[in-house]
A protein has these predicted regions:
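Expand to "…catalyze enediolate/carbanion chemistry for C-C bond making/breaking, isomerization
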Residues: 1-284
Length: 284
């Protein structure tokens, strides 16, 4: 991989969370999203976790290989009794993708890797410790992607909300969002953007997803099926963007250095932008 290439990430762009204790939602979540995250952590009350593990593993035992390749299991934080229970029950199923909640260090990733050596780990950095160790976490060989989470992050530092009343992120959340993206890129891994909690605010979700695309996030997580299409639309170039990118790349074939195109000066970074837009257009 060229060091300037974005990390490959086969699961995006819309990753949909689904409570692991709601088997009635599993099929619909998988059908409507690019990948489904079966959540054993925050979406399941402590008293319900044992049942959730049971119904989730029943589901995992019956899905085909294609569905399995698009299924992520979010497990509880390393070093907890719930983590131990999660990995014990999952040992017989060997999920392809595991999301580790509240990842604090590369050793947390290693704790997953020891038990699931073939799994790709999506490390969820959603605490002050995880954010501070983002580069170390991203650098672990088993880490396929890192994701950030806003609300648990703010809780971990004593705050009360991740956003201002107008819906924009507070500076600390914006800082961590950028830090996660930079750590992922520096280590050649994919970055996944946090969820947008206001299900009714489609315009806000669309704007945030568009910013995720423009900034370099490989995917964005979501919590409701209605959020999938706005995320997909944000990652899909418009007809005008695709036409410009293809025309620019065609023109570049006739030049060996910087050149003018449609009133602008074009150099290598702008060609890389065009290549990525063309790739997203092809992925459709």
């Amino acid at each position: 991989m060229n060091r300037n290439d974005p990390a490959a990430f086969a699961l995006g762009p819309a990753l949909l969370f689904c409570p692991a204790g709601r088997p009635d939602r599993f099929a619909k979540a998988a059908e409507r999203s690019d990948a489904v995250i079966l959540d054993l952590e925050d979406a399941v009350a402590p008293a319900d976790k044992e049942r959730a593990r049971r119904v989730m593993t029943d589901h995992l035992s019956g899905i085909d290989s294609h569905t399995a390749s698009r299924t992520v299991v979010r497990i509880n934080p390393a070093g907890t009794a719930e983590f131990d229970a999660d990995v014990q029950v999952l040992a017989g199923y060997q999920p392809e993708h595991i999301m580790l909640a509240k990842t604090q260090s590369a050793e947390d990733v290693q704790a997953v890797h020891r038990r699931f050596p073939d799994a790709q780990v999506i490390a969820l950095c959603e605490t002050a410790g995880g954010a501070a160790a983002a580069h170390e976490i991203a650098g672990h060989p088993a880490t396929s992607a890192i994701m950030w989470g806003a609300e648990d992050l703010v809780v971990s530092i004593g705050g009360t909300s991740s956003r201002h009343p107008d819906g924009t992120y507070r500076d600390i959340a914006r800082h961590v969002r950028s830090a996660i993206l930079l750590a992922a890129a520096a280590c050649g891994k994919a970055a996944v953007d946090a969820i947008y909690a206001d299900i009714s605010d489609t315009a806000g979700l669309s704007a945030e997803a568009a910013d995720a695309v423009g900034s370099g996030f490989a995917a964005k997580a979501c919590i409701h099926p209605s959020q999938v299409d706005p995320i997909r639309q944000a990652y899909r170039p418009t007809a005008e963007e695709a036409e410009y990118a293809h025309a620019l790349l065609d023109e570049a074939a006739h030049h060996s250095g910087a050149f003018q195109f449609r009133g602008g000066m074009i150099d290598t970074p702008l060609l890389r932008h065009a290549e990525r837009i063309a790739q997203r257009a092809l992925a459709g």
